[in-house]
């Protein structure tokens, strides 16, 4: 690769990353507005009071509460721990965790933008299958003693929370200005939780789309880019390599979607892409946090459950879609690359939802000053993973700025 060619590819990679983000911006905003409103008006305390210990109803409630929660993996992990410690059953708690990272509204919008309706259906139907397979595996393995030991560990380490927490009526809250100010605070907290993952994910996706040759994907994912329907062993290999690839990206589900679109554009099977998307809970930061909460034995048990469930789900979804003739065919080009910055529906949707963000910013910071406590999230010293992500995001911004300069002067 000569020097001139590198600078051309560099600028192309950066423009691709920015094009990815521009294409997805309205979907991010819409998803986080809906998610923030639901989280404010349906509180964690209400979830704790409603979810039971076990049974179909409790699993269904855990799934529903996950669906209406934040898509941030780290927030979902903390909420799952809290629900489990408060008495929610192990399976309903894991159902909440899986739903909050695979069934949330905003994720569906982003998948629709980058991958199309088949993957949206695959995400939601597959997400439900993922929970069912997880439930079956737990019932088969019956880790009763381990669950009892872990719950005791949590209660001994953190103590019991107050049981008499007052749960506000959402019907009254939704009619108040203060309620919508809380929505605005939650909206910007959502962005604060995911900005690093999104920045890194979109930057890496643009770089991979331009710099990594198609032959690499064909080597990594057996049968990719060859057309037709690969054999079962190739599909199985794709569903195993998908989580491995996600493990090394170690970014959240929202940041992984543009990378999934790159895999799809390079001919990776439907099963492989679905497995990659479902793998945000089998990455190292999540394993480490689970170990911190529950101990390494439970962390590896959860890892094993999720890996087995997502491989089974991806295979079932692939052959189910194939049976009904619904398997999508890759065009060889990511949908987000086709027209990056045209004056089209994406442009007007972005303008409209940026205006919504402006209104939320006014609600958050306009008018009278409020106590700072509402915006604080997480608190304390940042973890090593958070610091690594922060500096990787800064490097990403430097990379993007350099590419824009290269695009202007080339």
Range-by-range predicted roles:
Residues 67-125, 213-306:
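Membrane-interfacial helix-loop connectors
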Residues 32-37, 128-139, 201-209, 242-246, ...:
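Hydrophobic core segments of alpha-helical transmembrane domains in multi-pass membrane transport
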Residues 23, 27, 31, 35, ...:
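Alpha-helical transmembrane segments in multi-pass membrane proteins
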Residues 42, 48, 184-265, 270, ...:
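Transmembrane helical segments that form the transport core of multi-pass membrane transport proteins
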Residues 1-17, 410:
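Short, strongly hydrophobic alpha-helical membrane anchors
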Residues 53, 58, 120-165, 289-373:
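Juxtamembrane and boundary regions of transmembrane helices in multi-pass small-molecule transporters
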Residues 157-184, 369-385:
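Membrane-interfacial, low-structure loops and terminal tails that flank and connect transmembrane helices
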Residues 7-10, 14, 57, 61, ...:
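Alpha-helical membrane-protein architecture signal
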